[in-house]
Amino acid sequence: MLLTMLKAKLHRATVTQADLDYEGSIAIDRDLLDASGILPNEQVDVLNITNGARFTTYAIEAPRGSKVIGVNGAAARLVQKNDLVIVVTYCQMPAEEARNYAPTVVLLDEGNLIKKAA
Protein backbone atom coordinates (compact mmCIF):
# COMPACT_ATOMS: atom_id res chain seq x y z
CA MET A 1 0.00 0.00 0.00
CA LEU A 2 1.25 3.47 -0.89
CA LEU A 3 0.66 6.40 1.44
CA THR A 4 0.63 10.03 0.34
CA MET A 5 2.97 11.94 2.65
CA LEU A 6 4.01 15.56 3.07
CA LYS A 7 7.24 15.98 1.08
CA ALA A 8 8.04 19.65 1.64
CA LYS A 9 6.51 22.76 3.17
CA LEU A 10 7.26 26.48 2.98
CA HIS A 11 5.49 27.78 6.07
CA ARG A 12 4.19 31.37 6.33
CA ALA A 13 5.55 32.64 3.03
CA THR A 14 4.52 36.20 2.22
CA VAL A 15 2.99 36.75 -1.23
CA THR A 16 5.04 39.43 -2.98
CA GLN A 17 3.02 39.63 -6.19
CA ALA A 18 -0.14 38.36 -7.88
CA ASP A 19 -0.32 38.52 -11.68
CA LEU A 20 -3.71 37.58 -13.14
CA ASP A 21 -2.49 37.92 -16.74
CA TYR A 22 0.42 35.49 -16.39
CA GLU A 23 -0.08 31.97 -17.72
CA GLY A 24 -0.32 30.23 -14.32
CA SER A 25 1.90 28.85 -11.54
CA ILE A 26 3.55 30.14 -8.39
CA ALA A 27 6.99 31.73 -8.73
CA ILE A 28 9.25 30.86 -5.79
CA ASP A 29 12.73 32.24 -5.07
CA ARG A 30 15.34 29.65 -6.16
CA ASP A 31 16.88 29.75 -2.66
CA LEU A 32 13.54 28.67 -1.18
CA LEU A 33 13.09 25.94 -3.79
CA ASP A 34 16.55 24.59 -2.93
CA ALA A 35 15.97 24.76 0.83
CA SER A 36 12.65 22.92 0.57
CA GLY A 37 13.48 20.47 -2.19
CA ILE A 38 10.54 21.68 -4.30
CA LEU A 39 11.38 21.31 -7.99
CA PRO A 40 10.44 23.63 -10.85
CA ASN A 41 7.21 22.37 -12.46
CA GLU A 42 6.35 20.27 -9.40
CA GLN A 43 2.68 20.29 -8.35
CA VAL A 44 2.10 22.28 -5.17
CA ASP A 45 -0.87 23.09 -2.99
CA VAL A 46 -1.10 26.66 -1.74
CA LEU A 47 -2.98 27.28 1.52
CA ASN A 48 -3.79 30.93 2.13
CA ILE A 49 -3.52 31.61 5.87
CA THR A 50 -4.95 35.11 5.43
CA ASN A 51 -8.24 34.22 3.72
CA GLY A 52 -8.55 30.42 3.89
CA ALA A 53 -8.38 29.81 0.12
CA ARG A 54 -6.69 26.61 -1.07
CA PHE A 55 -5.57 25.82 -4.60
CA THR A 56 -3.30 23.57 -6.62
CA THR A 57 -0.76 24.86 -9.14
CA TYR A 58 2.87 24.22 -10.06
CA ALA A 59 6.12 25.84 -8.98
CA ILE A 60 8.35 27.90 -11.25
CA GLU A 61 11.70 29.39 -10.37
CA ALA A 62 11.99 33.06 -9.41
CA PRO A 63 15.46 34.62 -9.34
CA ARG A 64 17.75 33.44 -6.54
CA GLY A 65 17.76 35.88 -3.63
CA SER A 66 14.68 37.76 -4.87
CA LYS A 67 12.43 36.52 -1.99
CA VAL A 68 9.61 36.33 -4.55
CA ILE A 69 6.44 34.37 -3.87
CA GLY A 70 4.34 35.27 -6.89
CA VAL A 71 0.96 33.74 -7.65
CA ASN A 72 0.10 33.80 -11.35
CA GLY A 73 -2.90 33.24 -13.58
CA ALA A 74 -6.40 32.49 -12.34
CA ALA A 75 -5.12 31.70 -8.82
CA ALA A 76 -4.08 35.35 -8.50
CA ARG A 77 -7.76 36.02 -7.70
CA LEU A 78 -7.30 33.94 -4.51
CA VAL A 79 -4.44 35.97 -3.01
CA GLN A 80 -3.34 39.53 -2.46
CA LYS A 81 0.11 40.95 -1.99
CA ASN A 82 1.23 40.44 1.64
CA ASP A 83 -1.08 37.45 2.25
CA LEU A 84 0.56 34.67 4.26
CA VAL A 85 0.54 31.27 2.58
CA ILE A 86 1.77 27.74 3.11
CA VAL A 87 3.16 25.94 0.05
CA VAL A 88 3.18 22.13 0.29
CA THR A 89 4.12 19.17 -1.88
CA TYR A 90 3.45 15.50 -1.37
CA CYS A 91 5.09 12.21 -2.29
CA GLN A 92 3.99 8.60 -2.25
CA MET A 93 5.83 5.76 -0.56
CA PRO A 94 5.20 2.35 0.94
CA ALA A 95 3.75 2.36 4.46
CA GLU A 96 6.93 0.74 5.83
CA GLU A 97 9.08 3.58 4.47
CA ALA A 98 6.61 6.24 5.63
CA ARG A 99 6.99 5.19 9.27
CA ASN A 100 10.52 6.63 9.38
CA TYR A 101 10.12 9.41 6.84
CA ALA A 102 10.52 13.10 7.72
CA PRO A 103 9.45 15.90 5.35
CA THR A 104 11.44 19.06 4.76
CA VAL A 105 9.85 22.03 6.54
CA VAL A 106 11.12 25.56 5.94
CA LEU A 107 9.84 28.30 8.28
CA LEU A 108 9.94 31.81 6.84
CA ASP A 109 9.83 35.28 8.35
CA GLU A 110 7.76 38.19 7.02
CA GLY A 111 10.43 39.00 4.42
CA ASN A 112 10.60 35.40 3.13
CA LEU A 113 13.95 34.85 4.82
CA ILE A 114 14.55 31.37 6.18
CA LYS A 115 14.14 31.26 9.97
CA LYS A 116 14.53 27.49 10.26
CA ALA A 117 14.81 24.54 7.90
CA ALA A 118 14.62 20.90 8.92
Curated annotation (Swiss-Prot):
Binds 1 pyruvoyl group covalently per subunit. Is synthesized initially as an inactive proenzyme, which is activated by self-cleavage at a specific serine bond to produce a beta-subunit with a hydroxyl group at its C-terminus and an alpha-subunit with a pyruvoyl group at its N-terminus. GO terms for biological process: alanine biosynthetic process; pantothenate biosynthetic process. Its EC number is 4.1.1.11. One of its GO terms (molecular function) is aspartate 1-decarboxylase activity. Pfam families: Asp_decarbox (PF02261). Coiled coil: none annotated. The active site is at S25 (schiff-base intermediate with substrate), Y58 (proton donor). Keywords: Autocatalytic cleavage, Cytoplasm, Decarboxylase, Lyase, Pantothenate biosynthesis, Pyruvate, Schiff base, Zymogen. The modification Pyruvic acid (Ser) is found at S25. Its main location: cytoplasm. Its cofactor is pyruvate. It is found in: Cytoplasm. Catalyzes the pyruvoyl-dependent decarboxylation of aspartate to produce beta-alanine. Heterooctamer of four alpha and four beta subunits. This is Aspartate 1-decarboxylase. The lineage of its organism: Bacteria, Pseudomonadati, Pseudomonadota, Alphaproteobacteria, Caulobacterales.
